[in-house]
Structure formats: C-alpha cells, structure tokens
Amino acid sequence: MREGIRSFIDGWLVAVAVGAVGVVGLCGAKTVSQTDLGSLQSSQLGPVDEAQAALSSARQAKAQAQQRLQQAQSSLKVAQPGQQSAQASIDEAEARLAQAKQGGDPAAIAQAKQALKVANDYKVEERDRVAYLQREIDAADAELSATEKRIDLAKAKLEQSRLEALREAKSPAANKYQGWEFDKAVADRGRDYASAKSEADKAQAKAQRSFDAWQLSKNQVASEKGLEPARGGPGARPMPQGSPVEP
C-alpha cells in the first residue's frame, strides 16, 4: 500500500516538473537566432528593417520621457520655495494693513487691503503651481512606464518580423520556429502597452486640469497687478515630448 502511494506521489511530482518546464519554455522570450537570420540577403530584410526602426523610435521616446521627468522634478524644486515667499508677502501686507488702520486714513486702508488680497491670491497661484508640477511628475512617470512597455512590444514585433523574413525567403530555418508563439508574445506585449498607455493618458489629463487651474490663478494675480495675462491660458499646456504612441 505504501509503495503504491509512493509510486503515485513520485509520478505526480515528475508530471508537475515536466509541466513546469513546458510553462517556462512557453513564457520565455521567443527569438530568432542571428545565425538563421544571417543566411538572408539584405534585400530580404525589409520587414526586419522596419521593425528595427520602430524599436529605435521607442527607445528615443523613452529617453525623451526620462528627460521630461527630470525637468518636472527640477521645476518642482525651484517652485517649492515660492510658497514661503508668498506667505512672507501676506505677513507683510497684514502688518501694513494694521498700521494703516491705526493711522485711520481710508485711502491707505483701501490700498493695504488690496495689497493683502493680491498677496493671498499670489499664495493661491504658488499653491496651484506646485500642485500642477506634482501632477506633471506623475504624468511623466506614467509616460516613462508606457514607453518601457512600448519598447517591449517593439522587441516582440522585431522577433516576429525576423520570422516573417525567413518565411518570405522560404528559408528552411523558418520551420524551426512556432509562429503562434511569436504572435502570442506580440499580443501579450500589446495588451501590457495598451494598459500602460491608458494610465499615462489619465495622468496627462490630470496634469492638464492642474495646469488650467494654475493658469487661472496666475492670470488673476496678473490682472490685479495690471500685468498682461499669461499667454495661452487654460488648455494651452504644451504637449510633452516623447508621448507614447503605437509603434
């Protein structure tokens, strides 16, 4: 009885091990060997050249996304002290108003009240500026993640194009590969990229709304100071460089 149970367990463990090896094999990256590809003429590599160009474009987009993230982080560091400066302006304006009230001059009081209003509005502007830059960092980070998924997709498409080139050239080496495995890799990477791009689009929308709020408060302060409003206004946020697009 014990030997029967032991034999059953041993057989089950072997089956599990074999199955695991099969799963690992299916989940591994599907690639076409350079040796097989090297048997083709350059004129037979059209699909490969196009896929390689798409991969290069995806890598360039990632570099741009990294640069945008760094710029947003640097801008936030510069902007953060502005909130302290705004509070200092409020404190100064409040002191002037108190002094004006003691003097009893209506004109001086009105002027001090206006200065206090401008100082408070300036604080709102600085708050909105920091909030926008924080959203900009989130958007840049999401964009960077999307470009990484785009690179993964481009790599899968590159391998798929290599197999396609072998098949079009009627190379016997093409029979060594299972086309469905390459198709599955492209489909899986495509879903990952689509999900990441959706998150990046949502982050971009949030950054745009924060930018619009900042522009409104900025224009409010400019109007009170008799200055020209910010060019463009709400909705004029420049589109970031290197936005993830379908390769």
Regions found by a protein language model. Name each.
Residues 2-16:
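Bacterial N-terminal signal peptides that target proteins for export
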Residues 17, 21-25:
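Hydrophobic core
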Residues 27-32:
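Bacterial signal peptide processing site
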Residues 33, 37-242, 247:
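Extended amphipathic alpha-helical heptad-repeat regions
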